[in-house]
UniProtKB/Swiss-Prot annotation:
Native source species: Arabidopsis thaliana
GO cellular component entries: mitochondrial inner membrane; mitochondrion
Main location: mitochondrion
Function in brief: Mitochondrial inner membrane calcium uniporter that mediates calcium uptake into mitochondria. Constitutes a pore-forming and calcium-conducting subunit. Mitochondrial calcium homeostasis plays key roles in cellular physiology and regulates cell bioenergetics, cytoplasmic calcium signals and activation of cell death pathways.
Presence of the UniProt keyword Mitochondrion in the record: yes
Protein name per UniProt: Calcium uniporter protein 1, mitochondrial
Reaction equation(s) it catalyzes: Ca(2+)(in) = Ca(2+)(out)
């Protein structure tokens, strides 16, 4: 009897270990249910909370430049408040809660994408580093200083060229709008005062057909849809290419120095142009246009 009781107790203990959800205890014909939290439930709760590793993965998947451009467009400067960064991360769907937004902000700060200091977010940490270097000069190689100075001169020249090209494009577009308004006014005058609709109907028809033919010819020559956005981009690149050539701007040298200092074009005037007109422009486009 003692051995049978021992076997029963051993079997019961094994059953308790094998059960992942409940343990049944028999005592005096009564049974009580005790719930045990399984490891799978703990894993599900952990999955609901964002971790630093998951936030880093999100940072790699999300286009951080779009987020920075949105912040620059809202604040119109290089510094925004910490609450603005949290609201932007939640508004873009990066974070689902304020806690996740705080974690994502710390990841951006650790990665060097932004600089968080005293409830302020600096969107261009490289500019802060330049200011600190000017205030506290470090021991640098004279050759490195010369290269840095050369890069700053080329960057300033590039910004001036971009702004000038954008102004010329805007003037051309406004002239095109004025020409269209004059054409409509002329047709209106000829239709109701000088001639009649019977005379002007074929003229307006051929004028409209000419516009369609011009758009189709644009598609054949460029292999792109004849949209106003694409036309504006090509016009900007054309003016930029001419200005780069007239100012004798060394594009290859600029790209080399840009890669050397690991800086992106978001620091240049092209970023503000993208924010205003929505054009995705890069110096590679101008280089490709020059090769063509």
């Amino acid at each position: 009897m003692w051995s049978m009781g021992l076997i029963r107790r051993t079997a019961m203990s094994n059953a308790i270990r094998a059960s992942s959800q409940r343990t049944w205890l028999g005592h005096g014909g009564l049974r009580s249910c005790v719930t045990v939290k399984t490891p799978s439930e703990d894993e599900e709760e952990k999955k609901k909370e964002i971790t630093i590793a998951e936030a880093k993965k999100l940072m790699r998947l999300v286009n951080v430049e779009d987020m920075k451009k949105k912040l620059v467009g809202v604040a119109d400067r290089d510094v925004v408040s910490y609450s603005t960064l949290l609201e932007a991360s939640q508004g873009m769907g990066i974070a689902r809660s304020p806690d996740e937004a705080h974690v994502f902000a710390r990841v951006l700060d650790d990665a060097g994408v932004v600089l968080i200091f005293r409830d302020k977010v600096y969107l261009h940490p490289d500019k802060v580093v330049d200011l600190i270097r000017r205030a506290m000069p470090l021991d640098q190689n004279p050759e490195e200083d010369q290269i840095k100075e050369e890069f700053n001169k080329l960057r300033i020249m590039k910004e001036e060229i971009d702004v000038l090209a954008h102004r010329q494009v805007r003037k051309i577009l406004w002239c095109g709008l004025a020409t269209s308004m004059v054409q409509i006014g002329l047709f209106f005058r000829l239709t109701f005062w000088e001639f009649s609709w019977d005379v002007m109907e074929p003229i307006t028809f051929f004028a409209t057909a000419t516009g369609i033919i011009v758009g189709y010819a644009y598609f054949l020559m460029t292999s792109r849809d004849p949209t106003y956005q694409d036309f504006m981009k090509r016009l900007f690149l054309s003016r930029q290419r001419k200005l780069l050539k007239s100012h004798k701007f060394d594009c290859e040298r600029f790209k080399e120095l840009e890669r050397l200092f690991k800086m992106t074009s978001s620091c240049h005037a092209a970023a503000s142009i993208r924010n205003r007109v929505g054009l995705e422009l890069d110096l590679e486009d101008a280089l490709q246009s020059r090769r063509d």
